[in-house]
Amino acid sequence: MLWEFFALFAIAAALFYRWASANNDFFKDRGIAYEKPVLYFGNMAGMFLRKRAMFDIVCDLYTKGGSKKFFGIFEQRQPLLMVRDPDLIKQITIKDFDHFINHRNVFATSSDDDPHDMSNLFGSSLFSMRDARWKDMRSTLSPAFTGSKMRQMFQLMNQVAKEAVDCLKQDDSRVQENELDMKDYCTRFTNDVIASTAFGLQVNSFKDRENTFYQMGKKLTTFTFLQSMKFMLFFALKGLNKILKVELFDRKSTQYFVRLVLDAMKYRQEHNIVRPDMINMLMEARGIIQTEKTKASAVREWSDRDIVAQCFVFFFAGFETSAVLMCFTAHELMENQDVQQRLYEEVQQVDQDLEGKELTYEAIMGMKYLDQVVNEVLRKWPAAIAVDRECNKDITFDVDGQKVEVKKGDVIWLPTCGFHRDPKYFENPMKFDPERFSDENKESIQPFTYFPFGLGQRNCIGSRFALLEAKAVIYYLLKDYRFAPAKKSCIPLELITSGFQLSPKGGFWIKLVQRN
């Protein structure tokens, strides 16, 4: 009996080894330089074992590529062709975009799937959609992020930002010994903005700190060990996940957002309510609200899942990603007092020019140094660590006289953080220097070396929204407070090694010093 057990174990181990190492010679067979993978974990073992931050691992892999323009790496069993040359990035994302239209098919659903199945909303989002479905949805959503729409949305952001600072002044208990948990503060702000601009809800998470909308959002965006393992399985065992119907996100939270969107659509239709937010725009796209414009432009019938998914991913991306940008901005201003002082002087000047009136969209868009500061934060701490593309038809690249063939199904990887921290493109990359993005210097930045929101037609559709949110928060905080190091501040900043999110060990803590 014991021998039978050992025999079965040996067979299982052999089968696992064969499966786990099946792609190990992928780059060797093509004559492409690569980093030797660890069995099953590829080159990401440190991240999955929670020993190193993914951000640091990707930066190291980029550096190991040396002078190679293409360099092979592995994410678990998945071979990724890392691109280390700006000209090749331009070719992939612009010139030959028709070969690289899609992100890889990790979460995506097909048009044949049950349109009423809400278990995989991320798979029906704009990010995961493919080919013609992506193009149609991109066209549907684009009007929501034009300059005129941003101007309308800014009125709401402005109000929420003022309320957030007012709550700090009114309730000192939320600031422990003048030390503020910036992550908590910023996620509450992004939560309230998105509640209104996407879902049509009025929420104040600074006063009603346990409101349902905020609590459900926290559940969705907090990456526990189990959540990280689910992500790992989604990447490694896509087919099995579909058979077993593994749900990536908490079911209760997902169902909450599904009902929120569908009930809002039903109520608005019954009561003829029109509101300038994402739900209204998606109702127009679906034909629930008929306008001359939508009659002329309707090209596809969207399902309930398609509609809900766009609101869902807008919340998911905005809740966490925008908040992290705000937190890193505050942290860098705290560590670089000279930069903070110069930015404060710009804030003072704008405040004086407004003569007691509310901050306007035009005023904040005209703040050049604030724009430089935020751009430099995005260079040093890009939320999108890397950008991927899946090849949909064979193509051959001529790289320094060598023919490199990329086949249908191959995955291209553009390491954002690697380029942003490469001294070849950004001198002294670890220095926080907003002057890189001044009018005099920004033209010298080599094209396709700075892409915090992606590149080409598949860049982040909500980038302008995220930038506007971050600028509003920093403006109001800096107007009334100086950022100083707190006892809990992580200096120098070290990233946590758990999960996929960018965050310092111990969190984002800032000491607020009241200005006279």
Swiss-Prot record:
Major location (coarse): endoplasmic reticulum
Sites where the protein binds heme: C460
Localization of this protein: Endoplasmic reticulum membrane; Microsome membrane
SUPFAM superfamilies to which the protein is assigned, alphabetical: Cytochrome P450
Gene Ontology biological process: wing disc development
Record-level GO cellular component terms: endoplasmic reticulum membrane
Topology in membrane: Peripheral membrane protein
Source domain of life: Eukaryota
Cofactor entry: heme
Single GO term (MF): iron ion binding
EC id: 1.14.-.-
Keywords associated with the record: Endoplasmic reticulum, Heme, Iron, Membrane, Metal-binding, Microsome, Monooxygenase, Oxidoreductase
Family, per entry: Belongs to the cytochrome P450 family.
Described function: May be involved in the metabolism of insect hormones and in the breakdown of synthetic insecticides.
PANTHER family, per the entry: CYP9F3-RELATED, CYTOCHROME P450
Name by which UniProt lists this protein: Probable cytochrome P450 9f2
